[in-house]
């Protein structure tokens, strides 16, 4: 035979762009500040809109027949995005008897819209990213069901091309052609950037004792839990919700087909369940007691006797309470990195 010989060389990669410039932002806002009840109450509201242009983006509307694709083209100042929304803040301070009370809250709603990104005209409107929020995930829509053995043999049940197993996720056939493929991907869930952010604080003090609480929350937001939902044996481990997996093993008397909430755990099986889908993107809205502190400030006169400028003892904590729809993981955690699959 012949001994192969390799030779290092160079080739042109992505084209450069010497004309890159700054983004352009045009902002407009209207605000109102109100004070009443001798300034005990303060209310602030602000309406805003921002239009950004010249955003760096790579064209995706160049035909493949040209010999170029998005991986070879340089980024250009072509993107356009609109952000608009409102925010308001309310605060209250008062002394009730010997108790000093301070309450406050804020709420922000901001929605973005992709106006232009040089996107090719795709076959179906639900595939387009234009007119969706920034950070909007795309993928398959999970029907809430899993493929059963009968489904695999039924030609009327839409299925993807390639390997598929009983217990895999069943996705919607959006275009009705009987095949689950890239034409069935659409915007799923909310954006990964929360549209709503809010918080409120409570502060009470009485004769040196004090209690400070700060709550924080977010809504209209989705998070992708790749490692935990896509790679079930991530870090060679499983989680409690994996107990609700799809199982059909009549010899051992196991049948969870009617109650399963998670696909079958199979190493080296179908990769179809790993595809981006609404199964992986969860509603990660939450309300959390972000910080809490209870303490006592010693009297100034006592501190002076001890030659101290001040003395305080306190207990504090963070993330003490969380209210969310997920339950088994921190809703602010977003595992976008590639997971690990265990060994058989």
Could you describe each region identified by the protein language model?
Residues 2-9, 59-60, 174-180, 258-271, ...:
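Active-site-adjacent bridging/hinge elements
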Residues 49, 60, 215-219, 228-229:
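A short beta-strand motif that forms part of the nucleic acid-binding face
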Residues 76, 95-192, 230-232, 244-255, ...:
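Conserved small-residue
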Residues 166, 218-312, 317:
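Extracytoplasmic gating/loop element in the C-terminal half of outer-membrane beta-barrel translocons
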Residues 191-226:
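Glycine-rich, aromatic-lined ligand/substrate-binding cores of catalytic
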């Amino acid at each position: 035979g012949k001994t192969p010989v390799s030779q290092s060389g160079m080739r042109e990669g992505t084209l450069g762009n010497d004309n890159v410039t700054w983004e352009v932002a045009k902002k407009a806002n209207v605000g109102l500040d109100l004070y009443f009840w001798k300034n005990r109450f303060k209310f602030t509201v602000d309406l805003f809109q921002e239009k950004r242009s010249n955003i760096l983006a790579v064209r995706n509307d160049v035909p493949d027949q040209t010999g170029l694709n998005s991986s070879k083209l340089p980024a250009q100042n072509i993107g356009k995005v609109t952000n608009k929304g409102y925010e308001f803040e309310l605060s209250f301070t008062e002394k009730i008897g010997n108790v000093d009370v301070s309450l406050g809250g804020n709420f922000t709603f901001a929605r973005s819209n992709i106006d232009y990104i040089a996107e090719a005209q795709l076959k179906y409107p639900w595939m387009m990213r234009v007119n969706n929020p920034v950070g909007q995930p795309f993928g398959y829509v999970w029907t809430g069901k899993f493929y059963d053995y009968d489904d695999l043999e039924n030609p009327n049940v839409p299925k993807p091309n390639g390997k598929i197993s009983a217990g895999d996720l069943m996705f919607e056939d959006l275009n009705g052609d009987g095949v689950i493929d890239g034409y069935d991907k659409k915007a799923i869930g909310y954006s990964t950037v929360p549209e709503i952010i809010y918080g409120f604080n409570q502060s009470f003090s009485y004769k040196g004792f004090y209690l400070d609480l700060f709550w924080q929350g977010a809504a209209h937001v989705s998070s992708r839990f790749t490692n935990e939902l896509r790679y079930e044996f991530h870090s060679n481990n499983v989680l409690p919700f994996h107990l609700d997996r799809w199982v059909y093993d009549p010899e051992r008397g196991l049948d969870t087909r009617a109650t399963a909430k998670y696909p079958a755990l199979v190493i080296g099986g179908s990769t179809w369940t790993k595809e981006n889908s609404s199964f992986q993107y969860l509603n990660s809205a939450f309300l959390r007691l972000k910080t809490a502190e209870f303490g006592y400030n010693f009297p100034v006169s006592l501190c002076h006797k001890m030659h101290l400028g001040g003395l305080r003892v306190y207990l504090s904590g963070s993330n003490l309470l969380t209210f969310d729809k997920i339950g088994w993981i921190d809703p602010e955690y977003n595992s976008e990195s590639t997971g690990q699959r265990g060994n058989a």
